[in-house]
Amino acid sequence: MTTAIFSKVQVDMGQFYGRVSARILLNVPQRELSYQSFGEKQELKNSIGLVLDETEMQSLLPFLRAELFEPYRDREDMHDEVGYLDESWRMFTGISDSHVPMIRLPMNVIHDLAHRWPTELLYEQIVRVIRARNDRRFRKIAL
């Protein structure tokens, strides 16, 4: 049996809830990773894209397994939280090409190392991939 993975991942970020100021998109089948930033009126201000190589994709795949995210679907309580993102928010959306329905999970809570959600682990790995590229287009972006 093949393990279902997310084929598309989106992480929306903002300072005012509901207004997206930045977005990370991962398209697994196309091996594309992009970052977009938006202005106050939600107009696209900047868009940067990367085509991921085999090593970068392999580093992301363990974090894309849909089964890791299922225990958090519809969860309202936040066990073992440490704190909240200060004056900002993030929202994870994962879509698979299999039987697993789309999942949306908030990323506003900071957990201790023993209780980190898979959304946090995936986000951190995406940031590591971006930073390892040392692409000058990403240098001024706070991820």
Regions found by a protein language model. Name each.
Residues 21-43:
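Short, flexible N-terminal segments of the mature chain
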Residues 27-33, 53, 71, 111-113:
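Short, low-complexity, polar/charged sequence segments that are solvent-exposed and flexible
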Residues 37-73:
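A short-motif feature that recognizes glycine-rich, charge-decorated loops
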